A protein has these predicted regions:
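Residue-level signal for inorganic ion chemistry
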Residues: 10, 62, 172, 209
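Short amphipathic beta-strand starts and helix->beta connectors
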Residues: 35-47, 101-105, 176, 208-212
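A mid-sequence, solvent-exposed acidic-amphipathic segment
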Residues: 130-186, 191
Length: 249
């Protein structure tokens, strides 16, 4: 899991990010914030963890999957116009773990079970099985569960503290709010039980032979899947494996 730690700094940083991301920058005073940036149509572009940068200049660290860092920099640069905002690679690396948190570590804002994160000169983790943790707690990951066609509410962002419905406008807010208040989600992330062996990406077939979704991250006999919930009411097949819905995300 390669991560890039960007720095966003300048006198307009907080207001600039507030108008773009799905969460409320005011929460940064209490600790790290999980958020995403969306297209105007409400679809996923990138998700990240924000924290206050060391020092007193009001800068913000943006912890993002390295595969999305160039896109995120490009998108932030496009929106900044005349704002006093500078965007750069901090050069910091991510360390993470589940045990006692070392000095300078911060809690993962998505779920307490994900432990701590610390930024410094070296990358690494404490050997915890983060795939199993992600699957157990239905935490989607870029390039696996999350992609350009994803809607964040289908991917569990409300449960993972990644969206605030009381803040002001941000890019993609109208679509996200409509999904929250006017529609029942018919598709989305789910935790499933797996009996047999199936590879990530396998299409799920319901009892009537219809496509019910797709398998994603697999850890032992548990997996994450993107499902059509109306077709996930009974056993499904993923190749030769049997799949059963356990919990909607």
């Amino acid at each position: 899991m390669a991560r890039t730690i960007l720095t966003v700094s300048g006198s307009d940083t907080i207001g600039f990010l507030q108008g773009l991301i799905t969460n409320d920058m005011a929460k940064l005073a209490q600790g790290p914030v999980y958020a995403a940036i969306l297209t105007p149509q409400g679809k996923y572009l990138a998700d990240f963890i924000l924290s206050a940068a060391p020092g007193a200049d009001g800068g913000v660290l943006v912890d993002v999957d390295s595969s999305l860092a160039p896109l995120l920099v490009q998108r932030l640069s496009m929106y900044k116009l005349r704002a006093d905002v500078q965007i750069a690679d901090s050069g910091l690396q991510l360390q993470r773990g589940k045990g006692p948190a070392p000095q300078g570590a911060l809690p993962d804002p998505r779920h307490p079970a994900l432990g701590w994160r610390r930024y410094g000169p070296e990358a690494g983790d404490d050997g915890s099985d983060f795939l199993a943790l992600r699957v157990a707690h239905m935490v989607p990951e870029t390039g696996i569960e999350l992609g350009p066609d994803s809607y964040i509410l289908e991917m569990g962002f409300e449960r993972l503290n990644g969206v605030d419905f009381r803040k002001g406008c941000y890019v993609g807010q109208e679509v996200t709010a409509r999904m929250k208040h006017k529609t029942e989600l018919k598709k989305g992330l789910a935790l499933v039980a797996l009996e047999g062996t199936a590879q990530p990406g396998t299409v799920l077939i319901d009892e009537n032979g219809k496509e019910a979704g797709q398998l994603h991250s697999v850890s032992g006999n548990r997996a994450l899947a993107y499902l059509r919930f109306d077709r996930a009411t009974g056993p499904m097949q993923a190749g030769s494996a049997t799949v059963q819905l356990l919990e909607r995300g």
